[in-house]
Amino acid sequence: MPSPEMMPVFASTKLKLHPDEYTIVSLPVEKQDMALELFKPLSPFSSITVDTEEVSLILKTSEWEKMKEHFPVFESEAPYSVITFDIVLDLSLVGFLSVVSAILADEGISIYAISTYLRDHIMVKTKEADRTIQVLEELIQRCKSTND
């Protein structure tokens, strides 16, 4: 269960399950310029992260299928579903994803977490998406009933 300070945050949270299937891709860092150019027209939800070792992409599987021919070397994993926590989270908020991660870990559900400036998102294997939503909705309902 979340801390008493976190209960109202979870009680106010809505979940959004994105309808598309997604792929997580790792490209060699040398392909950064090509990746940034090719992925300019990506539609939401998508993400590009560049670090010293790789270019990591999250995009709709249908978009990746059209573009992967440009990259002879890559690693990828799919299908994933994206779940957005539809609540604006203050950057000073501590522990939101740790609560989510712990509850889902107890259920044997692995997550890939993505944070943006305003919201957090998780990716789960598509076959686990419905169960993940159920577990998270139960958490939200428990927080709502405790808050009342």
Residue ranges and their predicted role:
Residues L93-K127:
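A structural feature that tracks compact, well-ordered secondary-structure segments
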Residues M1-I103, R131-D148:
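Regulatory modules associated with amino-acid/nitrogen control
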